[in-house]
Amino acid sequence: MDDFFDGDLHAGISNIVLEPEDFDLGEGVTIRKTYAHLMAHFVMAFAPPPPNSFHPGPWKAAKGTSSFAVDIAADLCIPSDREKRFSIAQTIAFMLRLGINPAAVVAAVANHPFTSLKGVPDNEAIIIPIETLPRMFPLSSENDVATVESLEWIKDHWVSTHALIQEYPEFALAAAAISTGQFVHNAALILVSLWAALEALFSPSTAELKFRVSALIASYLEPPGEERYTLQRRVAKLYDKRSSAAHGQPSFRSQDILDTFNLLRRVITSIIENRHVPTKEELEKRLFGCSSG
């Protein structure tokens, strides 16, 4: 994607409300309020086009749910001197979903600020739609406002989070699963993909997966005691739902999917704040109350 952009990359974020007019995320990256409306509608023509021209009218608009329209409310700018600009934009958008509003999406990327695109000649403007599919399992937040405090959290952690995604395939899978799970059209596949991410992080072997994964997750998230035991039992029950989904037995509910999203979100947040993906040895030492040093 970076090949399309010689200069700055502007990612248009939807479903987010910035509290400040603009905010410096560090490393030259900024986010600021903007407005643009991205739309796409299916239209049918009834005659072939002449050479090097368009289909002649009349045209008819197609009805249905496949049209797309969204308001872009924030312009995330990744400067030209940064490598992997699109990957950085994806990481920050993932953190906006994780920490502020799970409905946040990168609707489009452009090579100019969205406020000035209307004045850029057509042959110079590049606008590429990105996340345009409907969300089949939409997650939402009671508050979609990106406060200064929540943006400070992203500022403090996006560089290390991007490095973890680049270095650890299991963490990259977890980030992808929680980011794309809402767009998967099959509920069983959502549940299986979320658990695949958890297993990649917490399964040292294929033996006794249910107990091992649930015990390691609980020991990672809770100190020894009653809360760790209670969490292990809850996670083990969720794992049963994963198994039924994987074997085509729809004995799970929407709440089970939501609970698994929240479990993975909690794990990812802990990894981000620790700036470290735990090794299998560290997890097993933690399980038995040993020092990881």
Task: Please state what every model-predicted region is.
Residues 1-189, 266-293:
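Charged, non-catalytic interaction/linker regions at domain boundaries
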Residues 171-174, 187-194, 198, 210, ...:
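Short runs of predominantly hydrophobic/aromatic residues within well-ordered alpha helices
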Residues 174-181, 195-198, 217, 242:
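Short alpha-helical scaffolding segments that buttress acidic/His motifs in well-ordered protein cores
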Residues 177, 194, 210-214, 251, ...:
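Composition- and surface-driven signal marking solvent-exposed, interaction-prone regions
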Residues 181, 185, 198-205, 220-221, ...:
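Generic structural signal for hydrophobic core residues of well-folded globular domains
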Residues 186-190, 209, 227-231, 253-257:
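Residue-level recognition of alpha-helical structural elements
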Residues 192-229:
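Flexible secondary-structure boundary motifs
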Residues 229-255:
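Histidine-centered, metal-coordinating catalytic motifs and their short helical/loop contexts
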